[in-house]
A protein has these predicted regions:
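Short amphipathic alpha-helix that is part of the acyltransferase structural core
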Residues: 1-51, 161-162, 171, 181-183, ...
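Conserved beta-hairpin
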Residues: 42-59, 225-230
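Conserved beta-strand in the GNAT
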Residues: 49, 53-65, 77, 82
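Conserved acetyl-CoA-binding loop-helix of GNAT-fold acetyltransferases
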Residues: 83, 89-104
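Conserved GNAT acetyl-CoA-binding A-motif
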Residues: 104-121
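Conserved catalytic-core motifs of GNAT/GCN5-like acyltransferases
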Residues: 115, 131-148, 232
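C-terminal "cap" of GNAT-fold acetyltransferases
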Residues: 142-165
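Non-catalytic, surface beta->alpha helical segment in thiol-disulfide oxidoreductase systems
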Residues: 228-252
Length: 252
């Protein structure tokens, strides 16, 4: 039987958080992520992982306090469910999701929701996996979809109106980010250095409160890219991927 661990204020310092294990360049990001989790545990934030060395975990909390531009009540929101490498194909993802569903029912929640996309994108869940458990698309912004599993007739969560704009006034390349992911800190640092070295303007907007997260002008889990006022992607960038993205944009 698989053994799992839920992170707490008592064990978080000695436990890994699955991503960026042993990768030195991301250790500052791991520290930032752990601090973020510590501050969210009081909100009922759950980080449950396999008791093993690997990327195998699920992370969720109440939609009311989740750092996403989604309005709703009495639902749990899944930030991330990830099973990677040799742990795939062993039913672990099923066990993690079933834990979320059962935990939500025990808390008398009205359902569970999560962000996916019509076509697979980095750092988002797989739509077909959630469909297998009865999740249905309840709201859409472009390629991005909000899926929900309903337990009763309570009002379903929706994207906030601000998120539907997918536009900003700023024309320079702009990144919205939060430390919900341990890969973010290094991306911000490397992009910032790249911009300085190449005399480029890249704006960084830190999302560090619930209010800011609920009012971002796009879909958002931990990173969003804008250029010439338009939303481009939710992909976390480094210098190399930024260059590749800008080349692609200029060729279009």
């Amino acid at each position: 039987m698989n053994q799992y661990i839920n992170l707490t204020l008592e064990n978080i310092e000695k436990e890994h958080i699955c991503c960026a294990i042993g990768d030195k360049k991301h250790q500052a990001g791991v520290t930032q992520k752990k601090e973020w989790i510590k501050n969210k545990i009081k909100d009922g934030h759950v980080f449950r992982k396999l008791d093993a060395r690997g990327k195998v975990f699920v992370e969720y909390e109440s939609i009311e306090t989740a750092w996403v531009p989604i309005s709703g009540s009495n639902y749990e929101y899944i930030y991330c469910l990830w099973v990677a490498g040799s742990f795939k194909g062993k039913g672990i993802a099923n066990e993690l999701l079933e834990y979320v569903i059962n935990d939500s029912k025990e808390k008398a929640k009205s359902g569970v929701c999560t962000l996916v996309s019509k076509k697979k994108k980095p750092f988002l869940g797989e739509k077909k996996f959630f469909e297998h458990y009865g999740f249905k698309v309840v709201d859409t912004i472009g390629e991005y979809e909000l899926m929900a599993l309903q337990f009763d007739n309570h009002e379903i969560p929706r994207f906030n109106e601000q998120a539907r704009t997918m536009k900003i006034e700023q024309q320079d390349f702009t990144v919205y980010y939060s430390y919900e992911c341990p890969y973010v800190e290094y991306g911000v640092k490397e992009l910032s250095n790249y911009a300085e070295e190449n005399n480029l303007i890249i704006n960084f907007i830190k999302i560090d409160t619930l209010e800011k997260a609920k009012n971002v002008p796009c879909i958002f889990n931990n990173w969003a890219n804008f250029y010439k006022g338009e939303f481009i992607s939710n992909t976390i960038l480094n210098a190399k991927s930024f260059e590749k993205l800008m080349t692609k944009i200029k060729e279009e």
